[in-house]
């Protein structure tokens, strides 16, 4: 699903970015064609402080956190109802060089495929290396994404490391993934810190 709608910023004045225990999520609207620097910095600050963010990608909305924050990783695993060490989360990276920080050296053919396909709506399952966070050390492979979405890429660039991510599932039997950010906010506002549209 391509998201080319015009976006603006709406901030919830009751939200406190640093005290993440007493919160109702903030709903941020950001222009994909020109992501607002102030809004992106707020998202990065929340991620660095252990927050969870729902954000648009080039496919469906993702639920993500900073790869270096164990408590945030545990929160996502709890929300998804899985043990962290058994969770199959993707690493959202900013570009191919970022990917190489977390995977073993790949052959030329695989590199050419990645270069041609990314950024794009694909998750590549690749062999992980020794730089994986301790929570993922037992995994031999990791899912790697570089979404074709300026908001997601700018968040990862400014954060300086990948976002651990999973898709937002809908309980509706007909519609498996939610694509309406206002409905997502309504459902997730007490579980996450920011919902971005």
Regions found by a protein language model. Name each.
Residues 1-22:
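Short, basic, low-complexity termini and linkers enriched in Ser/Thr/Gly/Pro
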């Amino acid at each position: 699903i391509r998201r080319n709608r015009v976006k603006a910023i709406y901030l919830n004045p009751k939200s406190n970015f640093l005290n993440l225990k007493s919160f109702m999520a903030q709903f941020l609207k950001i222009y994909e064609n020109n992501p607002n620097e102030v809004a992106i910095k707020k998202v990065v600050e929340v991620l660095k402080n252990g927050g969870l963010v729902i954000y648009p990608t080039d496919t469906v909305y993702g639920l993500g956190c900073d790869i270096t924050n164990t408590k945030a990783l545990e929160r996502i695993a709890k929300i998804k109802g899985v043990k962290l060490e058994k969770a199959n989360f993707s690493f959202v990276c900013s570009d191919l060089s970022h990917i190489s920080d977390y995977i073993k050296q790949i052959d030329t053919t695989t590199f050419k495929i990645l270069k041609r396909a990314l950024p794009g709506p694909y998750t590549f399952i690749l062999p992980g290396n020794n730089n994986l966070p301790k929570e993922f050390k037992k995994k031999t492979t990791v899912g790697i994404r570089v979404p074709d979405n300026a908001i997601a890429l700018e968040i990862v660039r400014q954060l300086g490391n990948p976002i651990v991510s999973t898709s937002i599932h809908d309980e509706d039997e007909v519609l498996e993934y939610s694509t309406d950010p206002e409905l997502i906010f309504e459902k997730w506002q007490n579980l996450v810190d920011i919902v971005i549209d």
